Amino acid sequence: MKAKLSFTLILIFGILITGCKQKEEHVEVEEVKIDLLNDDFPEAKQEVKQTMDSISKSAQDGDIDKLISFHAYSPKFTEFKDGQPRNDGEENEKYERNVFGSVSEILKFDMNDMKIAVYGQVANVTLHTDFHLKFGEDLVVVNEQMTLLLVKTKNGWRIVHEHHSPLIMEENK
């Protein structure tokens, strides 16, 4: 009889424990698919546009240190210009400090037909320059195709590659 009572108590205790157990919540997490090639990334695109505006302003203000700060110089930094072999970050910084440090006046600093393509943490910016720069009395007009590759860093969007090619302008007929 004692065994039946013990068995019955254990059975009742087991039923109570099982019945009192809270239902576990099952939360489904829907995976968000990101299409790096086709998604527009509008917020990042706006950040890149603001970076480009700041780059332009720093050049026009003659703030060379600020202009240089938009570059992420590292062993990975590269630049192509004037059909010459690839430059590294050190050569790029030296060139930009020399050129923009020698400009006596900026008459025009237009970045035309700008296209910003964002691929997550990387952005490709293509544009046509129409820069009219004075070096003393000499006027230099820079019309070129420019490509800037930017990467999102803890300090914002920074240039990791530059490519400059001549822009062939068609004469008005």
Residues of each region from the PLM?
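Short beta-strand edge/turn micro-motifs at domain boundaries
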Residues: K21-E28, N143-K173
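Hydrophobic pocket/interface hotspot
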Residues: I55, L67-I68, K76-F77, N92, ...
